[in-house]
Amino acid sequence: MPNILPGPLRGFGVTFGTMFRRVTTEQYPDEKKPTMPRYHGRHVLNRHPDGLEKCIGCELCAWACPADAIYVEGADNTEEERYSPGERYGRVYQINYLRCIFCGYCIEACPTRALTMSNEYELADDNRADLIYTKEQLLAPLAPGMEPPPHPMRLGDTKDYYRGTPAAHMLSGEDDAASETTLDRSDDHSATYEEAERP
């Protein structure tokens, strides 16, 4: 008759040994581990300091997406109804989080840094339709001092917006020499997800 005791005894030995080790289980969602600064979470459509949208409706993010998770439909700005600097804006913007693999290719493809990724990772839902995020859900909330579009360009011409001329200088009307100053991306004053919680 084969000896069946060594196997179960070895199993109990492993169990007994782990009883005295430090617990590695995290009590989620009561205890949430902070994410790394460059974590790829939910997308955010950023704004310029006066509230205009950075998205120009070029669709490069949609073309770069390997999962075909992004749908963009651009439209023309008019002086009476302006949503972004320049000629066009993203009239329709959707991200399907049932498809998205959070690779970040869309972020790299964006020419105006309109699209960035936040640290939000709690996207689970019991309704598939609710995981197709619309432009209204993705837009960064208006920070203090911002005006909801549509409205005219408040910070100069299109070049001033895309060069990142400091908004404080443009609004205060200081000398033109200072207008040549540009901002590094790390000092971007645009509204991002971290400035206000999603409604």
Swiss-Prot record:
GO terms for biological process: aerobic respiration. It comes from the Bacteria. [4Fe-4S] cluster 2 binds at C65, C100, C103, C106. Residues 45-75, 91-120 form the 4Fe-4S ferredoxin-type domain. Its cofactor is [4Fe-4S] cluster. HAMAP family: NDH1_NuoI. [4Fe-4S] cluster 1 binds at C55, C58, C61, C110. Keywords: 4Fe-4S, Cell membrane, Iron, Iron-sulfur, Membrane, Metal-binding, NAD, Quinone, Repeat, Translocase, Ubiquinone. It catalyses: a quinone + NADH + 5 H(+)(in) = a quinol + NAD(+) + 4 H(+)(out). InterPro entries: 4Fe4S_Fe-S-bd (IPR017896), 4Fe4S_Fe_S_CS (IPR017900), NADH_quinone_OxRdtase_chainI (IPR010226). NDH-1 is composed of 14 different subunits. Subunits NuoA, H, J, K, L, M, N constitute the membrane sector of the complex. Belongs to the complex I 23 kDa subunit family. The keyword Transferase does not apply. This is NADH-quinone oxidoreductase subunit I. Pfam families: Fer4_7 (PF12838). Binds 2 [4Fe-4S] clusters per subunit. Its EC number is 7.1.1.-. Residues 182-199 have a biased composition (Basic and acidic residues). GO terms for cellular component: plasma membrane. It is a peripheral membrane protein.
